[in-house]
């Protein structure tokens, strides 16, 4: 029986800024069985893409990606916000739905030729995904897929990266 994960995602209006509807995944995380099932679904997707490693952007990508990597017995690579990693890094900038930022990965985090699946909580404008893809490719890896709890199709993230296979548990159309 398929689970309708949208029943467990809280919608918070005007957070973090006026006009934004924040999709809060913490109700899923608070339910151990639901979290396990969501993780398993993303892990099955990553397995189908023959991933060698999982990348998760800071911060909720850690929460989503680490258990996927663990379930599959794969390594996990954090894509961190600037100045959080102690060794030499590669950096890429991106725009958010409500601002801009950069992501960094250690220069030795992705091995040449590795097949990478990115896991995160939400894809909106695909800015984080685009920056992560740039980092992965600059380090010699290949982004073979991206898995999200939530996708906001109206923001056309898929259209911005048509060469990336994208999987999501829930899609929210409109506000």
Swiss-Prot record:
Pathway: Purine metabolism; AMP biosynthesis via salvage pathway; AMP from adenine: step 1/1. GO terms for biological process: adenine salvage; AMP salvage; purine ribonucleoside salvage. Its EC number is 2.4.2.7. It catalyses: AMP + diphosphate = 5-phospho-alpha-D-ribose 1-diphosphate + adenine. It is found in: Cytoplasm. One of its GO terms (molecular function) is adenine phosphoribosyltransferase activity. The keyword Glycosyltransferase applies. HAMAP family: Aden_phosphoribosyltr. This is Adenine phosphoribosyltransferase. It comes from Lactobacillus helveticus (strain DPC 4571).
